[in-house]
Amino acid sequence: MIEVRDIRLALDGDLKAACAKKLRVPVGDVLEAALLRRSVDARRKDDVHFTVTAAVSLRRGEEKFSPYTPWTPPRVEVLKKKPALRPVVCGAGPAGLFAALTLARAGAEPILLERGSAVDERKADVEKFYQTRALDTESNIQFGEGGAGAFSDGKLNTGTHDKRGRQVLHDLVQAGAPDEILWQAKPHIGTDRLPDAVKGLREMILAHGGEVRFRTKLTDIELSGGALRAVRLAHGGAVEALEADSLILAAGHSARELFALLKERGAQLEQKAFSMGVRCEHPQEVISRAQYGAFAAHPALGAADYRLAVHLPDGRGVYTFCM
């Protein structure tokens, strides 16, 4: 197969025909065409179309073009000997879930701790709060399986150009996310699919020998000689000392008791810059019309988004996100 870039594809266009036109070959010579990346070109509101990269198989003449190198997952180093003590991961948001999955694949049998509930029970806890204003301090919008973004639309953009990010997308698809995140220029899972993908990641961790404990809160860290010896856990009314020599803290930004504990135990903490802002809401049809003009209602496009940013002379700035 060959890789073909910068293919112009009409919103209702046929991918094979578009590839043939780009390559200047008969349509019948295009045996197969698969999307690798697709973005919307809306610079001209009277000519909104897709720009596509595709993997193409030709009947003849592939040697004239750049070959397609398919993505291959990174090699997993499986431990030859299991560690004497199982690694502990604190927090079942994105960082914790993927840390636990990576350790599980390596044969380390990690223990993943989450102070909140599993995502289905958490949805019920959040809905109860909306209806009654009865707050469950351990299972809510901030705490629980999936992290603080579990009920968002699951945008997957990152400014980090790390090849391992591709593995994350493939893992999410395996966990139940839609296949199109593999080729969308701005991939997102969708609010309706994200909780199921989170459950799927948990099941993958369990299938590889990991353990997941919900409603289990890390309350203390025992150190000796500058090394970790155990973690103390609270589950319901029970307290447990779990012997451990490795701990990954993926607690997010709201577990303030944990940060206070770390400071008390002498851990080095560093301030992180944060942004303050306001929530802006627009009718979706207004944004889609502004971005896509007369094509706004086309079913191939879906909801439009936008991003605005300004950098001020004093070094500060204003920007939009998740729009």
Report each predicted region and the residues it spans.
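Residues forming the flavin
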Residues: E3-F50, A55-M323
